């Protein structure tokens, strides 16, 4: 069943399924993205840094968070028009190969648009690892179809 703008309310909370991030997935993301910082690709180098080992690029974390949200049933692909933006992204803890992450989302605001067929959903996403540590936080805005017309 399609979920429209009116089907959400401020304060709604959702949690995505978890995903274990493999070494292979990180290697593909790093390769495609052109990431080459030694602390991301050289384990021995990274062990000697305050990080204590290799970590995933922050932008890879945001990419994986988007995938988890996409795979969940938080948004209906029939009614989402576009992701309009991501704001105030913060990386709190490193993501490492073998970590399992999930995203907790809360609808924080809803705004009508000039177009009566669309509305904006503003939400906060928090990515946590298997230990409950916050890996990243971001505020997002999605443009969603409305049930009501004019």
What positions do the PLM features span?
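Hot-dog-fold acyl-thioester-processing enzymes
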Residues: 1-84, 149-150
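HotDog/MaoC-like acyl-thioester-processing domains
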Residues: 3-10, 94-150
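Beta-hairpin (beta-strand-turn-beta-strand) motif
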Residues: 67, 89, 106-108
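Short beta-strand or tight-loop elements
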Residues: 84-87, 103
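Short, mixed-charge aromatic SLiMs
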Residues: 86-95
């Amino acid at each position: 069943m399609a979920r429209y703008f009116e089907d959400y309310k401020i304060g709604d909370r959702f949690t995505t399924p978890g995903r274990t991030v493999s070494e292979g997935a990180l290697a593909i993301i790093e390769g495609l993205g052109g990431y080459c910082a030694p602390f991301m690709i050289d384990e021995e180098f990274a062990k000697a840094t305050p990080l204590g080992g290799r970590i995933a690029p922050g932008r890879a974390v945001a990419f994986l968070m988007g995938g988890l949200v996409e795979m969940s049933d938080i948004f209906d692909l029939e009614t989402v028009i576009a992701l309009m933006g991501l704001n105030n992204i913060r990386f709190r803890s490193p993501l490492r190969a073998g970590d399992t992450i999930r995203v907790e989302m809360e609808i924080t605001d809803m705004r009508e648009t000039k177009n009566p067929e669309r509305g904006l959903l503003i939400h906060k996403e928090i990515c946590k690892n298997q230990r409950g540590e916050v890996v990243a936080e971001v505020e997002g805005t999605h443009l969603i179809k409305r049930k009501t017309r004019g």
